[in-house]
Amino acid sequence: MKKELIIGTRSSPLALWQAEFTKAELSRHFPELNITLKLVKTTGDVLLDSPLSKIGDMGLFTKDIEKHLLAKEIDLAVHSLKDVPTGTPEGLVISSFTKREDTRDVIISKSGKGLKDLPPNARMATSSLRRMSQLLSMRPDLQILDIRGNLNTRFKKFDDGEFDAMMLAYAGVYRLEFSDRISEILPHDVMLPAVGQGALGIETRTDDAETIEIVRVMNDSNTEICCRAERALLRHLQGGCQIPIGCYGSYISGTLKLLAFVGSVDGKTALRNELTKPVNTPEEAEAVGIELAEVLLSMGAEKILADIRKTR
């Protein structure tokens, strides 16, 4: 058994929370392990002046950490799963999918009002094309403003009056104890989350069997089935973090229900569909994701995504 483990992580408050949570859980199961953190600055942390959709690079928040992992400078990397591209680099694998937090998105507004009750032409901040597309399909009057930076930075900009409302993932808001600022939690029939939202992905080297065995104690089988289905759908659509695709899987009593959305950035075109099938393994879940992706492509998703890629 290893005596030491080094966890690679970004240095944002949320990333540190996630890494410390992972460290605490692993220490609980393996008290003899000496576990330390190595902080890594990623491209996404440095390039804060441009919208994420304009940078055009998958793995903005993961690539630099993965370099340290491949170089054996760290033993594992802890990511927000929604930031992890569906094609992991050769030699690396997501070995553990942690139990998922609430996957929904939330509205934080000056008035305390929810999405339907925001004033006409309200300024809404989000860095996500997925959120933008779904927002504009319901409220085409909204002025969508790009926002970058960690959660604390976003709340400061909000408190300084730079916009009227902002949309964030519930999981991050809850983990950093900003829940009292929430104006509305949006249900999935209004706003589908990003693929993998609410879960952590623990990445290891494929040849490091000992570390894989260690981190598997944190794996939640329901979360793995849902997230692998979602990631298979995203992979089949050749989408990434900055494409307007939303997806959510729920797994109850051996049945997987997968909801998915593909839309144009302006919100004028929105495709939604769902698929429910019995599933026993992560591989079967991935097949459901691919099948639903094919349904969306037959509905016209290919043209929507091609048009978006032309403008990037």
From Swiss-Prot:
Its cofactor is dipyrromethane. GO terms for biological process: chlorophyll biosynthetic process; protoporphyrinogen IX biosynthetic process. It is an enzyme of class 2 (transferase). CDD domains: PBP2_EcHMBS_like. It catalyses: 4 porphobilinogen + H2O = hydroxymethylbilane + 4 NH4(+). It comes from the Bacteria. SUPFAM superfamilies: Periplasmic binding protein-like II, Porphobilinogen deaminase (hydroxymethylbilane synthase), C-terminal domain. InterPro entries: HemC, Porphobilin_deaminase_cofac_BS, Porphobilin_deaminase_N, Porphobilinogen_deaminase_C, Porphobilinogen_deaminase_C_sf. GO terms for cellular component: cytoplasm. Its EC number is 2.5.1.61. Pathway: Porphyrin-containing compound metabolism; protoporphyrin-IX biosynthesis; coproporphyrinogen-III from 5-aminolevulinate: step 2/4; Porphyrin-containing compound metabolism; chlorophyll biosynthesis. GO terms for molecular function: hydroxymethylbilane synthase activity. Keywords: Chlorophyll biosynthesis, Porphyrin biosynthesis, Transferase. The keyword Transferase applies. The modification S-(dipyrrolylmethanemethyl)cysteine is found at C241. Binds 1 dipyrromethane group covalently. Belongs to the HMBS family. Tetrapolymerization of the monopyrrole PBG into the hydroxymethylbilane pre-uroporphyrinogen in several discrete steps. Monomer. The porphobilinogen subunits are added to the dipyrromethane group. PANTHER family: PORPHOBILINOGEN DEAMINASE. This is Porphobilinogen deaminase. The gene is hemC.
